[in-house]
């Protein structure tokens, strides 16, 4: 079973809640996503999410608040294949309003450029399906 760790990085600005999201700069068809990555063999999912936030967004000083949810999801393209998903809450107080970052690390997205921005609570429905499944636990 593939294991995935998702990062819900939140902030409050002018009394409004938002979650960090990104688009693939050169592939708009990929939709709006939150940072996530595959848990390596023997790796703790909490360490995965911190690593992925650093590699995908350059936010190497993001602070992990905790695990929000864990589930198992069958993949629509192959129902026999499932993902164990871990959703974590993090904060990154010094993150800019918008920026681009070239992905680092050993994953298949190495070298891609992601355009980051803060997605307000009222636009959470714009996230790629499955990415916002547990945001209701922290953004009200």
Language model: regions and residue ranges:
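Non-catalytic surface loops within mature trypsin-like serine protease
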Residues: 11, 61, 90-94, 120-123
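Short, charged/polar surface micro-motifs in flexible loops or helix N-caps
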Residues: 13-15, 27-29, 40-41, 70-74, ...
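Short hydrophobic/aromatic beta-strand or adjacent loop that forms the aromatic wall/cage
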Residues: 2-6, 83-87, 113
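The catalytic Nudix box helix
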Residues: 34-67
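Nudix hydrolase/Nudix homology domain
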Residues: 29-32, 97-140
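N-terminal strand-loop-strand
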Residues: 1-34
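Short, solvent-exposed loop/helix junctions and linker helices
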Residues: 39-43, 81, 113
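Active-site-adjacent beta-strand/loop module that shapes the phosphate/pyrophosphate-binding cleft
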Residues: 72-104, 117, 137-139
